[in-house]
Amino acid sequence: MVIKKLSLYLDTSVIGGYFDKEFEQDTRLLFQNIKDGKYDVFISDMTKNELNDAPEKVKNLLDGLEHRKIFVTDECEDLAEEYINEKVVGMASKEDCIHIATATINNIDVLVSWNFKHIVNIQRIRGYNTVNMKNGYRTIDIRSPKEVVIYELG
C-alpha cells in the first residue's frame, strides 16, 4: 500500500524549538524525519519574517531543510479575521490565526506548532475548524512535533 506523504506547515515555534531544552528532542527528531524525506514541508513568508530577529543559528536551520515557501494572502488575512470575529481567540493572537489560515487555504495536511495556548489546543482546534467549515474550507489537523514524528519500528 502506498501512502501519500503528509504535508506539514511549520510555524515559528517549531523552528525555535530546535534549540530549546524543553522541545529540542522531538523537534530534532522531526527535522531528521524531514531530512529523510518523510514529509513535504511548507514555510510561510510570515514565518520567515518572524525569524528575522532570531539568532543566526535559528535562521540558518531553514537553509538545510527542504521546504516550499507559501505566502500570506488577503484570503488568509480574511480567514484569520473570521477566527477572531468568532472568538476562537482574541485579537492578540492574530499572527497565530494567520498561520492557521495560511495552512488551511494552502490545503496543508498538518500545522505543526509548540504553541499549546493558542494553537495546539483541542478547544481552539475545534473552533478553527468550525470557522473553516462555515466558510467553505476543509478542516486542518493541528499537532505538536511529538505527535507527527515517525519513530522507527523496533
State where each predicted segment sits.
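Short, well-structured N-terminal submotif of metal-dependent ribonuclease cores
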Residues: M1-I43, N49-L61, I70, N85-G90, ...
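Acidic, PIN/NYN-like endoribonuclease modules and their adjacent C-terminal/linker elements
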Residues: M1-K5, S13, K21, K48, ...
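Short, charged/polar low-complexity linear motifs in solvent-exposed/disordered segments
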Residues: I34-K35, D96-I98, T130, R138-T139
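Conserved beta-strand termini and adjacent loop/short-helix elements that scaffold enzyme active sites
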Residues: S44, V72-T73, R143-P145
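Active-site neighborhoods of divalent-metal-dependent phosphate/nucleic-acid chemistry enzymes
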Residues: R68-G127, V149
